[in-house]
């Protein structure tokens, strides 16, 4: 028996998303209050300078909220995101802030707690869920806990409670898979797998867990919507079982305060390992990211669209075995990776955006990705800073690149926010349209996949996505050629005849025959 779907075509052209159309496309936001969002990762120190000192801060971020989400979903001039991930904001000794000195503070470079509260309150008013980076695998070596612990060791005061806050051992107790550093000439060593200035906390210590509970409560009580968990697989190095147990404990504590908090972990590993972590937390999908990931490979024509769709379906099946409510978290790049515009050229940046922004779950956009910012590691040390360059606003914002930057700014050839807002076919306008389509069609983020097998096609593929008895079809053409395809050869679903659209890249549906222009994705409803 054939299912008859009421199908209307919402097309996302990769060259001209702002073109006039003969009929109105329904892009009215369908707001559902749940955990599904479009997130935007921000390195506060490089985003926007609100006081003129060259450093990004919360005053600057507050001033840029209209760019991200102006609070009026019908106005349509903002990016349209409804989630923000803030990289570490607590007092630290480094530019990147992953070495926390005080867990209940705002780093002085970013302003005051009052500045943060003002930003957070306004973001919440606009329906933006703000999650913050939580770095609890390790602290700074300048944290008062560690200072107390090392002073106690040097004074042979081994019963001091802070000694047991950290993983501190004698020579004969050192494990070969871990990195250690001696405390003076004491014969005692602390674990520091990331850096000698980042000593590892001892999560077997009940006092440490009590401290973590207080940290969780402090930020959730302020109105933070959840956490991004840094180094989630390193709490117990090379021990997935104990890590999952720890994060289950953590989530129990989170839910005591905020049942709907969104928590996503950094587990940079294969899907077989990530599957286990989904028993406790949501995780980022690293297999989709970077130059060799599924998104870039599909956009650049290294693998077929059909293979990409098969991967999405298989990955979702894997994580949903661990947790029926598991949420996919796709992304192209983040602060630890070379920026995508370095390996995705021209239209391929838009193709890649379509692939992950039209997938299920919560996509994460790395700040500047929507304007094609570039940045990659250099030859010298400390060049992760090149991946965290100052946002290119194109106005009087004085925010500067972080310390350690060696990137040649002349390589930034894709323009600024200001220039792209003026250009109707810009990458920024493309992202704006994509997010509108996501917000108007809840089936995209929340739907259950039914893959359609296009195994005889390479540059064309797609699937059905069903949510609350409403089904949409999502199809991609990643090639430079127009493709005409009879959908009835691949699926028993029937689609309504489609009105034509005006634009440089037009998509047409004639009966069951779909004609889709180059570098175009369509949503059928």
Task: Identify the role of each PLM range.
Residues 120-122, 127-128, 137-138, 143-155, ...:
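Active-site-proximal helices and loops of the catalytic beta/alpha 8
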Residues 20-213, 221, 228, 232-277:
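Acidic/aromatic-lined carbohydrate-recognition and catalytic surfaces
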Residues 34, 331, 343-484:
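Loop/helix patches that line or flank the sugar-binding groove of alpha-linked glycan CAZymes
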Residues 82-83, 127-129, 225-227, 260-262, ...:
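Beta-sheet entry/capping signal
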Residues 2-10:
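Sec-dependent signal peptide recognition
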Residues 508-525:
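C-terminal beta-strand-rich structural cap/linker in extracellular carbohydrate-active enzymes
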